[in-house]
Curated annotation (Swiss-Prot):
Family: Belongs to the ThTPase family.
Protein name per UniProt: Thiamine-triphosphatase
Functional summary from the UniProt entry: Hydrolase highly specific for thiamine triphosphate (ThTP).
Cofactor requirement: Mg(2+)
Molecular function terms, GO-annotated: hydrolase activity; magnesium ion binding; thiamine triphosphate phosphatase activity
Length: 230
């Protein structure tokens, strides 16, 4: 993924007929894959409380999701995805208010920054792409990921990647159109896999995030992060 792209996404709860519906809409199955994601944070969840999500995907590398523009409300989230390790390290140091660590590898700064593993799970994914009827051929395709985690939670995600904030409203309109075509209720929200993992296996951490969420002006973005979190 190109550095600095803005990810606009909406999560939903898929049903048994979701893949068939995607085919009816002209969607193409790109691949099926299984992977392990491991998430890192401080014991106090300082990153998550700041709406930052650090993940290492097995055989893929590091990614840090940072919040997008303020004031975008609705059953969706908007994040900037950082994948270049020096950029990730610089942002981590900024959020955690740490100086003097340079811009090296992410793994090298985990200890100095007090970051530790907080969640790790395996996901089975089917990845789809499609273009809505009437869309400009030069517009990026919409992506739909259907995930099932190894702890039994299934979630879908409609995603568009854009380069500038000015492109976000158009991306949102396309995401909402496709969601409607898939039968997703207009205001349905679905938590990210990581949030459900914390709720089930680290309830105290989950409660801590809920308390932070309740004090925010934009609660939706913490309630449905992640993919955060993919």
């Amino acid at each position: 993924m190109a550095q600095g792209l803005i990810e606009v996404e909406r999560k939903f709860l898929p049903g048994p007929g979701t893949e068939e519906r995607l085919q009816e809409l002209g969607g193409t199955l790109e691949y099926r894959v299984t992977f392990r994601d491991t998430y890192y944070d401080t014991p106090e969840l300082s990153l998550m409380q700041a709406d930052h999500w650090l993940r290492r995907r097995e055989d893929s590398g590091w990614e840090l999701k940072c919040p997008g523009a303020a004031g975008v409300l609705g059953p969706h989230t908007e994040y900037k995805e950082l994948t270049a390790e020096p950029t990730i390290v610089a942002q981590l140091c900024k959020v955690l208010r740490a100086d003097g660590l340079g811009a090296g590898d992410v793994a090298a700064v985990l200890g100095p920054l007090g970051l530790q593993e907080v969640a790790s799970f395996v996901t089975k994914r089917s990845a789809w792409k499609l273009v809505l009827l009437g869309a400009d051929e030069e517009e990026p395709q919409l992506r739909v990921d259907l995930d099932t985690a190894d702890f039994g939670y299934a979630v879908g995600e409609v995603e568009a990647l854009v380069h500038e904030e000015a492109e976000v409203p158009t991306a949102l309109e396309k995401i909402h159109r496709l969601s409607s075509m898939l039968g997703v209720p207009a205001q349905e929200t679905a938590p990210a896999k990581l949030i459900v993992y914390l709720q089930r296996f680290r309830p105290q951490d989950y409660q801590r995030l809920l308390e932070v969420n309740s004090s925010r002006e934009r609660p939706q973005e913490t309630e449905d992060p992640d993919h955060c979190l993919g």
